């Protein structure tokens, strides 16, 4: 699916080619979401990555999740050749380090993620109205706090759970900023997003 979506970055993807890759009931919702919100690829973060690399040292790079001292050295040697996120990740790839791992490390760098927090909460992004009783039961039985409204999280979470939530929110805001600039659509803060009800 990713190859079909991003095979030609200068042309809108042919969404109908993806219809056979997903359940029939999902395709209309997918099509609506892409039309309304656009698509982002890792290359949409290229300028931000290039700017961020200018301020990093070997020590600071090594402090990010998944970023080893060896990868930090390679990044520093090649950082001025960062023409795009995906091309830079390919340049950094070795037999020992996959493109996927490097991409993940570069995203951790962009998002300033240095700590991997344990799962400390569950967050509901949407549900069917008919499943209200099930949601209530999950909330009652869950050992983790259940977040249905992002703005309530600081009141419901503490410690690592709150830190993990804040890290997730920061990543969402980062994504939303890039999406908003790329598509020319209004920025929507994570705390104001509505729960999706079907």
What does each model-identified segment do?
Residues 2-198:
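Active-site cores that bind ATP or allylic diphosphates and position pyrophosphate for catalysis
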């Amino acid at each position: 699916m990713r190859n079909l979506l991003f095979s030609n970055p200068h042309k809108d993807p042919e969404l109908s080619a993806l219809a056979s890759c997903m359940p029939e009931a999902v395709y209309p919702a997918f099509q609506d979401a892409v039309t309304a919100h656009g698509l982002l690829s890792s290359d949409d973060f290229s300028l931000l990555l290039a700017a961020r690399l200018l301020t990093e040292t070997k020590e600071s790079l090594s402090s990010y999740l998944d970023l080893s001292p060896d990868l930090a050295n390679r990044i520093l040697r090649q950082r001025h050749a960062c023409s795009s996120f995906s091309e830079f990740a390919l340049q950094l790839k070795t037999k020992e380090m996959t493109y996927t791992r490097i991409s993940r490390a570069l995203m951790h760098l962009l998002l300033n993620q240095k700590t991997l927090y344990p799962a400390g909460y569950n967050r509901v992004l949407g549900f069917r109205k008919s499943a209200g009783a099930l949601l209530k039961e999950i909330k009652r039985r869950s050992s983790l706090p259940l977040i249905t409204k992002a703005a309530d999280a600081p009141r419901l979470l503490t410690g690592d759970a709150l830190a993990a939530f804040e890290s997730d929110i920061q990543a969402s805001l980062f994504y939303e900023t890039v999406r908003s600039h790329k598509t020319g659509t209004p920025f929507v803060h994570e705390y104001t997003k509505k729960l999706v009800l079907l």
